[in-house]
């Protein structure tokens, strides 16, 4: 697994200040999701990792929904930077 392929949208100075921000949490979950998907491509029967991936996907989806309700502009910018598909809303 190559760690250099992961997204580095947030600079080091910003990560020290904003570790609790919604954007940083979504960014962190996105990196974890990318690592787990690359792991699951090699280990297809690793069901515990699949369960962990589904949990992280749910957490990220809830945070994205929260961010879209609170601030649409920041939500759109983050989705573009992280190359995430927009969630379907009812």
Swiss-Prot record:
GO terms for molecular function: structural constituent of ribosome. The keyword Ribosomal protein applies. CDD domains: Ribosomal_S15p_S13e. Pfam families: Ribosomal_S15. Its main location: plastid. One of its GO terms (biological process) is translation. It is found in: Plastid, Chloroplast. One of its GO terms (cellular component) is chloroplast. InterPro entries: Ribosomal_uS15, Ribosomal_uS15_bac-type, uS15_NS1_RNA-bd_sf. The keyword Chloroplast applies. Transmembrane segments: none annotated. It comes from the Eukaryota. Gene3D superfamilies: S15/NS1, RNA-binding (1.10.287.10). Keywords: Chloroplast, Plastid, Ribonucleoprotein, Ribosomal protein. SMART domains: Ribosomal_S15 (SM01387). Belongs to the universal ribosomal protein uS15 family. Part of the 30S ribosomal subunit. This is Small ribosomal subunit protein uS15c. It comes from Ipomoea purpurea. The lineage of its organism: Eukaryota, Viridiplantae, Streptophyta, Embryophyta, Tracheophyta. The gene is rps15-A.
């Amino acid at each position: 697994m190559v760690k250099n392929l992961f997204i580095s949208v947030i600079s080091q100075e910003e990560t020290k200040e904003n570790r609790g921000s919604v954007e940083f949490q979504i960014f962190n979950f996105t990196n974890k999701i990318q690592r787990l998907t690359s792991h699951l491509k090699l280990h297809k029967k690793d069901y515990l990792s699949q369960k962990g991936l589904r949990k992280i996907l749910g957490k990220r989806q809830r945070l994205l929904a929260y961010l879209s309700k609170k601030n649409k502009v920041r939500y759109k910018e983050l989705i573009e930077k992280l190359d995430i598909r927009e969630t379907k809303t009812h």
